Amino acid sequence: MSDVSSSVACVVVDYHAGAALTGCIDSLHANRVTNIVVVENGLAGSTPPALGARDVVLVEPGQNLGYGRGVNRGAAATGPAEYLLVANPDLVIHDGAVAAMVAYLETHHDVAVVGPQIQRPDGSIYPSHRVFPNLWLAGAHALLESPWPQNPATRIYRSPRSDGTVDWVSGACFLIRRSVFEEIGGFDERYFMFAEEMALCWQVREHGYTVAGVQEAVVTHIGGLSRQRAPRVMIIAHHKSALRFEMQTAKGLRRLLLPVATLVLGLRLFMALTVRPKAPIEEV
């Protein structure tokens, strides 16, 4: 297996994560990842200044680029590497997780993107390996998940295939072949935040590659640190990205029903802003 320290470059997009970012960098170093670039998407000087002493390259664009554009900027600043690891700043990568993902890619040559098992701080599993949603499936899942956790829509949405492949993995942490990342042009920068990982995995699959989850690789995601600063902005961005993905991928009857889907999503956004504007946001 390739040596992690020479084969993996990592990009972390920071938005006021504070001490959590330091913990993330420590866990990367524990996994022998040393080629690390942090992109400061928050206010100038908001990223902990001690990162320089940890051999981390800091990219300071002077503005919030959005997540996908930030990763693209960071990837361009990394040193040579066969694989690109994308990680949220509020993430702790368990020992051996990066090596497990590298090993999977080296033994599954048709797979271009892998995601780890993501745990919440309480140890519960976050469903980070999913099928591509449409507004109808995602809507049914969002409405039924709380009162009926095992409803058909949620089971379909969160079920990996028997061979371990999935449609997409969470953007909180994933490993992608650098050559494929460059082949598809990186993240679609029209997505400011939310659904950008779905769009990336869609492009990966459109180019003939597959996506998979690696249960042996485990990370813990604190979650929500960036979103707590501007919940209303995040809610709006979430819905805009969901609509963009539907417009990008809908075919046949789904495309004919786009006006209806747009209306439904608009009503859902209105309710989210007026009824529960401070509710936590998870990917639908």
What are these regions (language model features)?
Residues 1-27:
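N-proximal low-complexity "stem/linker" segments adjacent to membrane-targeting elements
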Residues 26-35:
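Short, acidic, metal-binding catalytic loop of nucleotide-sugar glycosyltransferases
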Residues 60-79:
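Glycine-rich, basic loop-to-helix element that forms the pyrophosphate-binding segment
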Residues 81-92:
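Short beta-strand-to-loop acidic/aromatic patch adjacent to the donor-nucleotide binding site
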Residues 92-127:
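Conserved donor NDP-sugar-binding/catalytic core segment of glycosyltransferases
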Residues 133-166:
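Short, flexible, basic/aromatic active-site loop/helix in glycosyltransferases
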Residues 161-162, 167-218:
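A short, conserved alpha-helix in the catalytic core of glycosyltransferases
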Residues 202-279:
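Active-site-adjacent helix/loop segment of glycosyltransferases
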